[in-house]
């Protein structure tokens, strides 16, 4: 089941925010934001109140019109990928894409507004030491163990460009399984046992430039 979350600011707490759902959910989600070398470091800590399979996704809206933007995922996507065949990931298929981090040479997504000459990037900070098998390659899948792989990408939210990222991995609207082959989307769920916590960190950077 999918639970839309809202960010609630905290006071007198180690964390800056708590992600809350309208209904009771079996996990607490706290978020801390710090500034490191002019970059915002976002740390999310999930703690299970009972055994739960989870997939966490966060979106950060820019102030960029999606139609004014170019996009970058290292080794996978450049600008709008319109030079790629229609059977490959590109704007021919969709203007919103999220992919497994191991599709990329670096787990980074960049959005550049050509009119404002501004950009925003997100990069995951993690050690990639393990992966887990799943019985299926599409739809909602349960992982057999623990993975290090999350996802990253960009989305069109009502005409506004947004960074999208999360854990464990997800690929949408299609999965690129091999050269010139698009398959249905996949969302992986990992077990978090009662009392266990997982900490996830991403780094957000904003700036100005003439191009990528």
Segments predicted by a language model, with ranges:
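Short Pro-Gly-centered flexible turn/kink motifs
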Residues: 189-211
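Beta-strand/loop-rich accessory regions of lumenal/periplasmic or secreted enzymes
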Residues: 1-194
